[in-house]
Structure formats: structure tokens, C-alpha cells
Amino acid sequence: QVGVVIGGGNIWRGRFTDEMNPVSADQMGMLATIINALAVQDAILRQGVKATVFTPQEMTRFAEHYRADRAIERMENGEIVLLAGGSGNPFFTTDTAAALRAVELKADAVFKGTTVDGVYDSDPHKNPAAKLIRDITYQEAIDRDLRVMDPSAFQLCKEQKLPEIRVFNMDDLGNIQRVAQGEAIGTRVHG
């Protein structure tokens, strides 16, 4: 069963706009995730696979209003569930929305696709000597302030005992399939 939390950074990085009201910027980011989810849904449907977009915002012409029981039912019926619109609230990242949805949907894991190979001991974009960490606990990631995901996402997964987050580089498209098949790439973050 597959649920995918969709990001919107390719369309909107509004949190970096200092002059804009942060609530408006976050709302624009949520809308960007919905645009992306509709594009992903179209690509999946063209492959002959059923997919439904869910949003916490009322947008019934484009997507179903999110309820965990409905999303679980769709997944149990073989559909791919696309979760867009973040948590529906400003000031919460897509990482936190992914953790929240994973807990609500009783997921076994979160696969976090990003632009680096996993969790590093420092930002590899700023420090070429940064070292990849293959295995780390939620608490260690929080204590060391490792920012590949926001600390509130790690904290929620820890508190709710989500078995693991797998952080991997999704720039290599083959990695999505590899991680879905259980290959131990990237970093395993766990309780």
C-alpha cells in the first residue's frame, strides 16, 4: 500500500520571502503541493493505476477532503493515495505533514526523498567534508540538530513509535524503486 506526501518546493519557496506575510507564504506553498499532486496523479492514471489526491483543505473539484479512514480504504483497494496541502496549517513543514500522515495511516515507514544521499553530520551543501550517517535514532537526530528533516517530524515519529524513516537521494530516479523494494540505501532513522 502506498501513500505519497507531495511537496511544492519546485513551485514555491515562499518562506524565503522576508517581506511576505508567513501565513500567506505557507498557504501558497500548500497550493503548490496540490498542483504537483494533480500532475503526479495524472502521470499515475496514464499508467493504468488508480490514484486519489487528498487535501486537508476543501477542494472537492480537484481532490477529496482528507480523512484517514477514507485514505486507508483507498489504499486497501489498491489505489495510490496522494496527500497534498501539507497539514492544512501554516508554520508546519511538509516533513511534519509526512510524519503526521504516516502516523495517522499506520505506516510502517516514511521514505523521505531529498537532494542528498541521506542524513549527514553537517550540511553537505555547505561542508564538502560532511560524513554520511547510515543509521541513527530519532533522539540522536534531534539532539544533534541534523536538519535533513525538521525536529518536530522526528519528535512525532519518535513519540508515536513509527518504525523508521528512510532518507535517500531521489535525484537518482532508480532510488525510489530501490528504497520501495527494501534496499538499504541512504540513512535509516528509527526509534
Give the positions of each predicted feature.
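C-terminal catalytic "cap/lid" subdomain
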Residues: Q1-G191
